[in-house]
């Protein structure tokens, strides 16, 4: 049995606190672009390694930098004059010694990485011309020998932690968290883009709850070729606002809602107009790990890990595995009858099996009529089950079926 500690969460339930702030950076935000590329590169490398070597080899591709380009957006359609520059860096296994054949097998790391980045951009930023609007530069290097040794040690056994680090998760999402998350998903959905094509992918949703009132302040890029006048632009905002308000009704749970879109506009001289749908075209830079946490949100009123999840290897990198695992365990513990809220923290120790954390800390707020003592064994059982089946988490990540930002 792992070192699992269960205790009462000594705080007011989040939905009953007077103030809550929640943020989500959308798919086209420069930081999210970097997160998405980093994870796509990692997933692509996992696939390539398995095809060529039968196993996932050591890599960390969590160092992606975006340098903003320069554009002249205008109603009816503008142009890019300086491309966005994206740097792929990090470490990966580029060659393997085949002792039986007596030769070195070279692996197509850089080609795989660049193709994955460009494929991701094609899906994520619909109006970006990949031939003219962006430059993707790959500078991924060979992995550190000592960390590769920790990664490769006793391959047939449980992977060993690459670092002494921790992961954090919580569940269930609060009303504000749900609305912020679902609002960005709506605005970047295929269905909404088909209906309102002028809505770009660079969207940031900031949610503020004061008592029973939730205010959403949304920054939403518009794509200039679909906007023929300032009146068109205003109409796009009105249509998007109506969609957000209608969608939010499913999650409001008695809360009042106010939606504000592009509050810096004057609707004549200053509007959020872009050529590509992202502010990355206008000098807005981006980096991995500066945006959403592993649950897709930035939640200053909850415990958070500052570590980036996207791009890290899914085999033994604690910054990835334990952050994702913490959220999975929290979600399952929160489903136990009598649990109102749950917070999880998991701490590793470098070189130790990832199934044996130094501590797995569970904090819960019981529902009225339930005692911590009766809930504790059930919560421990959930946590132990996931530690025993941690390879399932890795498989989900390798398959690209886990959201990391």
Curated annotation (Swiss-Prot):
> Under the GO molecular function aspect, what terms does this record hold?
ATP binding; magnesium ion binding; methionine adenosyltransferase activity
Where in this chain does the entry annotate a coiled-coil region? Answer: none
**Which pathway?**
Amino-acid biosynthesis; S-adenosyl-L-methionine biosynthesis; S-adenosyl-L-methionine from L-methionine: step 1/1
Q: Where does ATP bind?
A: 141-146
**One Gene Ontology biological process:** one-carbon metabolic process
Disulfide bond recorded as keyword: no
Please state the Enzyme Commission number of this protein: 2.5.1.6
- Origin: domain of life: Archaea
Q: What class of enzyme is it?
A: transferase
Q: Which UniProt keywords apply?
A: ATP-binding, Magnesium, Nucleotide-binding, One-carbon metabolism, Transferase
Q: What cofactor does this chain's UniProt record say it requires?
A: Mg(2+)
- What is catalyzed by this enzyme? L-methionine + ATP + H2O = S-adenosyl-L-methionine + phosphate + diphosphate
Which PANTHER family does the entry link to? S-ADENOSYLMETHIONINE SYNTHASE
Q: Which NCBIfam families match?
A: PRK04439.1-3, PRK04439.1-5
Q: What does this protein do?
A: Catalyzes the formation of S-adenosylmethionine from methionine and ATP.
Q: Which family does it belong to?
A: Belongs to the AdoMet synthase 2 family.
This chain's protein is named S-adenosylmethionine synthase
Look up and give the organism this protein is from: Methanococcus maripaludis (strain C6 / ATCC BAA-1332)
- Per the record, the gene is mat
């Amino acid at each position: 049995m792992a070192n699992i500690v269960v205790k009462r969460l000594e705080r007011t339930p989040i939905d009953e606190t007077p103030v809550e702030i929640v943020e989500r950076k959308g798919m086209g935000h420069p930081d999210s672009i970097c997160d998405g590329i980093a994870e796509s590169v990692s997933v692509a490398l996992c696939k390539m390694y398995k095809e060529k070597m039968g196993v996932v080899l050591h890599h960390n591709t969590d160092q992606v930098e975006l340098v903003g380009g320069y554009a002249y957006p205008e109603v009816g359609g503008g142009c890019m004059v300086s491309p966005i520059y994206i740097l792929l860096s990090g470490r990966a296994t580029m060659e393997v010694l085949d002792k039986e054949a007596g030769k070195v097998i070279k692996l197509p790391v850089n080609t795989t990485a660049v193709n994955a980045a460009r494929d991701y951009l094609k899906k994520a930023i619909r109006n970006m011309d990949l031939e003219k609007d962006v430059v993707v530069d790959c500078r991924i290097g060979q992995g550190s020998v000592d960390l590769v040794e920790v990664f490769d040690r006793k391959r047939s056994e449980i992977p060993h932690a690459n670092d002494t680090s921790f992961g954090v998760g919580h569940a269930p999402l609060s009303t504000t968290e749900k609305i912020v998350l679902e609002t960005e998903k709506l605005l970047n959905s295929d269905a909404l883009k088909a209906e309102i094509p002028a809505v770009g992918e660079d969207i940031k949703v900031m949610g503020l709850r004061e008592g029973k009132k939730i205010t959403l302040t949304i920054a939403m890029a518009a794509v200039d070729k679909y906007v023929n006048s300032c009146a068109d632009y205003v109409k796009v905002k009105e249509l998007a606002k109506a969609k957000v308000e209608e969608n939010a009704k499913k999650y409001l749970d008695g809360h009042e809602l106010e939606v504000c879109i592009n509050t810096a506009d004057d609707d004549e001289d200053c509007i959020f107009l872009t050529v590509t749908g992202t502010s990355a075209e206008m000098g807005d830079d981006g980096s991995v790990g500066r945006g959403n946490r592993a649950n897709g949100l930035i939640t200053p009123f909850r415990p958070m890990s500052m570590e980036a999840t996207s791009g890290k290897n899914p085999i033994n990198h604690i910054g990835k595995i334990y952050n994702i695992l913490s959220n999975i365990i929290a979600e399952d513990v929160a489903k136990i009858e009598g649990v109102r809220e749950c917070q999880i923290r998991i701490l590793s120790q470098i070189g130790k099996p990832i199934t044996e954390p130094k501590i797995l800390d569970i904090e819960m707020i019981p529902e009225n009529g339930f005692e911590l003592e009766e809930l504790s064994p059930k919560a421990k059982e959930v946590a132990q089950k996931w530690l025993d089946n941690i390879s399932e988490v890795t498989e989900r990540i390798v398959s690209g079926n886990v959201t990391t930002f």
